Amino acid sequence: MPELKIKTEKVEKQLTKEPLVLKTPKEKIDNLGKFYATGKRKNAIARVWLKVGKGKIVVNKKTIAQYFPSETYVKTILKPFVLTKTIDQYDIICTVRGGGISGQKGAILHGISKALDKSAPDFHAILRKGGLLTRDSRVVERKKYGQRKARKKTQFSKR
């Protein structure tokens, strides 16, 4: 019984301490008025700067049409602007590293969505409902020894 009393006294002391005050993080806005966010997908990491402009999109010092050969990639990257009805209202500058084209596309999409969310809090519900603010955490499964691929096995013979 004395051990239980000591433990309850410790818990009571912890409860009577002053509550922790959580600091709200500062919005990532630089001195030029750009909203900054990072996006990730597979092995790709994108750094995105968003500012009010005319709809110009630059990826690694190239236009989006030069960087992504397929038009479907461009359409998916512009999805946050279509949902929020802000096409041609923001200029985007982004740098992307790692992964392939599909992973880089997903990273840019995630970064743009996060930057748009910071620029106007009204967009949060729209972007969340569209599933653009959640990171797609799917990555390639590793190859196991004794198998041909991650899941594919060699042909089994009973005899």
UniProtKB/Swiss-Prot annotation:
The keyword NAD belongs to this UniProt entry's keyword annotation: no
Keywords annotated in UniProt: Ribonucleoprotein, Ribosomal protein
GO molecular-function terms, A-Z: RNA binding; structural constituent of ribosome
UniProt-listed Gene3D superfamilies: 3.30.230.10
Top-rank taxon, per record: Bacteria
InterPro entries with a match to the protein in the record: Ribosomal_Su5_D2-typ_SF, Ribosomal_uS9, Ribosomal_uS9_bac/plastid, Ribosomal_uS9_CS, Ribsml_uS5_D2-typ_fold_subgr
GO cellular component: cytosolic small ribosomal subunit
Matches recorded under Pfam families: Ribosomal_S9 (PF00380)
Example of a GO biological process term: translation
TM stretches of this protein: none
NCBIfam families, A to Z: PRK00132.1
PANTHER family named in the record: RIBOSOMAL PROTEIN S9, SMALL RIBOSOMAL SUBUNIT PROTEIN US9M
HAMAP family for this protein: Ribosomal_uS9_B
Family: Belongs to the universal ribosomal protein uS9 family.
Protein name: Small ribosomal subunit protein uS9
Lineage summary: Bacteria, Pseudomonadati, Pseudomonadota, Alphaproteobacteria, Rickettsiales
